[in-house]
Amino acid sequence: MDRRQCIQRVLAGERSERLPRALFGGGLWSYRQAGLLIEDIAKAPAVFAQGLANVFGDLNTDIIFTGSGLNSFPAETIGGKLSFRGEQAPLLLFPIIQKAADACYLTDLEIADSPYSLALIEMIAGLRKRLPDRYFCATSWGPFTWAMILCDWHLLQDKVVSDRKFVQEVCDLGVRLSLSLYEPLIDRGLIDGISIPDGAVTLIANDLYREVVIPYEKKLFDLVRARGAGCFLHQCGNIGQQISLYPETGADCITIDAGVSIGNAYRLYHERLVTAGNVDVINTIYGGDQKHLCTAVAESVAGISDPLYRYILMPSCDLPPDTPVNKVKEFLACADRIPS
């Protein structure tokens, strides 16, 4: 059984033969490891595919989050201008939605209008050929995080408290932007699942999240699952007050940040879905020594009542780009030192 099949079985609710493990994200980190500049992907997707294959081919990770760090690319389909910021994730030069009426006109989305998304798709195709045994999980923003990316901040702040219909419109636009990338990837058989980080929802009231945003997260997951892909939700930040709400999104796997008990999350989730996380990526993987790292992994897994059932060992969030590769390998190797 290869790594791809391992994760497929975990998501299907089957018991694992070994402890599943993966890096979450890792895009910006992997581009640095491969000596790649993000803005060059449109000119050389094959070079990116080979570079990332060299990086991930040397790592014992079951999942590759393809496109991690490049979540804003589909905004090109509605006129977004990308801002490349060195080793940081590209965002937009300016918000596309600067007044409420703007959201109504952004209806036609063609991935052909996004050169960077087209290049990303070709990069993923090349990576799939080189690493066919890994579970490929493509990333894009969650619906409300898209709203924060696309909207003038002062406009969104006002609408969050005064105009739920506007929030619904921009969340629906976010769903369509993500689908514009996911659908061609799924149609070509290039990915096994999708992942959306939607940590921006921790900045809004729980009732707004539950009543307005979750239906759009669920809409995206339902559409993708109908095409046979797995659905991952990553939530980071101050998630403690929302953690019981996340299963309502319909996700197959929820990957959680540090700051909450992985054991408590597993108890909430394990009868319905997979729990992943939440070894502290900053203080443990990036900043800790080998002994600290192994201890933290062992303590995290010890909080899981049945680590071989609906659980994946992961960091709490994305790797800092300058994380030493030996720390990453050590984290993944810890999975094989945990008694099964």
Q: Where do the PLM segments sit?
A:
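Short, basic/glycine-rich phosphate-binding loops at helix/coil junctions
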Residues: I97-Y105, S195-I196
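Short, structured active-site "lid" loops
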Residues: D40-Q50, L59
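Residue-level detector of alpha-helical secondary structure
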Residues: C6-R9, V47, G51-V55
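Alpha-helix termini
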Residues: F48, F73-A75, Q241, G263
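Glycine-rich, N-terminal phosphate-binding loop and its surrounding beta-alpha-beta segment
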Residues: G51-K81
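Active-site loop segments of alpha/beta catalytic cores
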Residues: M1-S30, G35-I41, D62-T66, R85-L92, ...
